[in-house]
Amino acid sequence: SANSGLHLGYLIDQSGNARGAYLGSGFDLKTDSYGAVRAGQGLYVTTHPKQSNSQPLDVREAQQQLVNAEGLLEALSGVSEQHNAGTLKAGHDALKQFADATQSSVAGGASGGRTAGGGTGNANAFKGPVMLFGSPAGIALSTQQSTHVAADQHVNLVSGQSTHIASGKSLVASVKDKLSLFVQNAGMKLFAAKGKVEIQAQSDNLELTAQNAMRILSANERVEIAAKQEILVTCAGAYIRIANGNIEIHAPGKIDVKGSQHSFNGPAQMPYPLPGFNKSELPARYRFSE
């Protein structure tokens, strides 16, 4: 029997004919072998309390929370697009499709005659074999090994307050197409207490733009600026251009040069090594279905 059993109601330890300690109340389904729960048309697991005459798939609380998440996704997606950042439309559409799939209707029919209309009417159902988990007080997943989440389409994380991610070692993300981060109100920070911070655009441009001041500081050492073809510094029509081994200093107004000494000697140069970049492509056999 693999020590299998279903314990219902007022749970008491039962060893042979002896009644033992109180274990709790409700139900306890367990086995020392394997277990499976299957529902071919959909499954709802919840801790939302209901009356005994409520419909099994009365998912109003969980469904309303999904609808609220839809609204937040849609609002933030719209603001992000207004600022030329990425859109959340694909995730919003997937979430809406799932929420809609939890609302359908099936009609009951009584066999062998109807007694005072018993067995008739309509009840909520799912449009497809989806799984929905809902709780008014929190959901946790815990394991001493690894947790895996895989989806052929989209993964949505939506929180009404904050989303926190903490890693005891490394946080590593690899993205095939695009990474977009957008903040509406309170700014963005990227700090490293130790080690370098490296930002590379290995096959295109790198653009840094600010509405107001932009500062580049080195607290202890130096700032290096190097380019293979040209460096151009310009403001209000005046500019300094460094290109082809030449330096141009032009201005529509005054050029003021001051120093205790001025040295104008013959030509000199300082070669500066520039990095090279690799090219790669994701093999087709590792792509999820599109």
Feature locations, PLM:
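Structural signature for extended repeat/solenoid scaffolds and their inter-repeat hinge/linker regions
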Residues: S1-A226, E230-T234, R241
